[in-house]
Amino acid sequence: MVIFNIEENFKVVEEWKKDEFPAWILMEEDEVNLLEKMFSYECINECIDYKQEQRIDCFKDYTFILINIIEQVEKQIISKELDIFLGKSFIVTVYKSNISLLYDLIEDIKEEKNCQLFKLDKSPSIILYYILDRIIINNYNIISDLETEGDKIELEILKDPESKHLNSLLFIRREAYKLRKLIKPIRYIGDTLVIDENEVIGEGNKVYFKNINSKIEKLITSLDTLSQELAIVREAYESELANKTNELMKVFTIITAVFLPLELITAIFSMSFESMPFKTCPYGFYILVFILSLMALILSLIHI
């Protein structure tokens, strides 16, 4: 567990008492029982359990948020649960596995990088704002990566469609579906924070969470656009595959058109009639081969 004094430029302190000073407390899941006197048993239990649904609950003097941090590992999307308790004088973040986003935020705050709001207000709700803002940016970057991968596959499909392209496309669509399931609930978290039923955010800071809500809407719009683009890529694959099949059928049609008359002639000459042209001619075979070859050449030129 790490306790930061927000007012003293995030100085690490050993102890903290409620309302003593604004604090940011980072905890691992096995330490969350230390806060059982401050928060409800249900919330504490959800911090320990895995695979809980994303949610937000407003209590008398704090708000509990369960949200997923999305990451890409070898192109596969995984989620890491982050539990947040927000009060007027504290913010507690509980994580089950290391989340680099939090520590990157701490470093940026100490270096006064991309965190200028702290010059105006060093409150826990501003920390929550920056956490959510970075989650949204992180999610948008993942969507952008999937879009780039989809565009790359589309270009390869237009050059030469292969079955591997379909497998890659299906993988991206599966990851996009997983991403949609993880991102959609964030919209309801944003709406609840804007309402601020228990007033832990404060009227002055609501404007920042309205901005978060706007970013969430844009994020979901980007996600919808990604789904549409992947559908277009799938259509492009099917179209190119159909064109390739049509070209192949065209070749078979030409072959059939060329050899069908030849087969008819050879079938006639294979009949057991005594009186048959070229049958008694010494050069009949060669003449017939020449005629058949000439016909094949003429028919090929006509169809090509």
Where are these regions (language model features)?
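Hydrophobic alpha-helical transmembrane segments and their immediately adjacent juxtamembrane loops
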Residues: 217-304
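Flexible domain-boundary/linker segments
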Residues: 52, 163, 186, 193, ...
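Hydrophobic alpha-helical transmembrane segments
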Residues: 120-121, 193-209, 227-242
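Peripheral, non-transmembrane regulatory/ligand-interaction domains of membrane transport proteins
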Residues: 1-195, 202, 211, 215-218
